[in-house]
Amino acid sequence: MLDAAVPGAVFTSPTPDQILPATLAANSGAGVVHIVKNYTGDVLNFETAAELAEAEGVSVRTVLVNDDVAVEDSLYTAGRRGVGGTVLVEKIAGAAAERGDDLEAVAAVGERVNANVRTMGVALSACTVPHAGTPSFDLAEDEIEIGIGIHGEPGRHRIPMENADGITDRLLEPVLADLGITSGDRVLLFVNGMGGTPLSELYIVFRRAAQVLADRGATVERSLVGNYITALEMQGCSISVLRLDDELTELWDAPVHTAALRWGV
């Protein structure tokens, strides 16, 4: 997967002087791919760090992840946000690097994953940002927020609480419509917890999403369920669908040994 990760403060972009040493450390002589979620601060800071790395002789390519169908523009982005699909980009691009692809090819694989993955999220509760000490938005016990982000951002609309199947349908419909999923498509289905939702409930969402895809004639060839890209203690989940081809499936299946993903070794 990744050779380096650069966290900023909670819900804050890392700075160029944090990104640069990570970039230099990750470079083995063939260059470095930055995988960046599409948030304005992240984009600007990674651009600056890439320029600094290039000045030190390290070639850098950037894959910008913007899989969130909930927004086109927000206070935090120009265009769609990068959310759950980032995990899939990281795994598959990392596998391409591991098999020996050059810098341009690894970046191209990452961009292909981003072009074929879409995500939508829901919150049943807000999260509390540590430096603020208060919930990021107010949500009644009988309400849910559709289209939330991963940094505690509110969603695009608020509706009364529904059962799990109803919520799943609301999340999945815009994802499938935007991807244009049709009969015969092969997909990876990723149900991601936002941090405070029991795993058993995530599998309830997965069951319904897989059923909807089957009804459309799509085949769920690969799946992932769990808490992988979270918003502290937020209760909720996101659904990501990635359209697969033979190469993307092969790269997803390639051995991986990390704290989060582990198979084939």
Across the structure, where does each feature detected by a protein language model lie?
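Short glycine-rich or small-residue beta-strand-to-loop segments that form or flank ligand, phosphate
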Residues: L2-A5, G31-T40, E47-A50, R61-V65, ...
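Glycine-rich oxoanion-binding loops at beta->alpha junctions
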Residues: L2-G29, L176
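Short, acidic/small-residue loops that bind anionic groups at enzyme active sites
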Residues: A5-V10, E54-G79, D215-V220
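Extended, charge-rich low-complexity interaction segments
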Residues: N38-V43, K91-L103, L244-V265
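Short Gly/Thr/Asp-enriched flexible loops that form oxyanion-binding sites at enzyme active sites
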Residues: V43-G57, Y76, E201-R207
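Short alpha-helices
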Residues: L64-A105, V109-R118
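Mixed-charge interfacial surface used for oligomerization/domain docking
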Residues: R99-I204
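C-terminal non-catalytic interaction/assembly regions of soluble proteins
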Residues: P174-V265
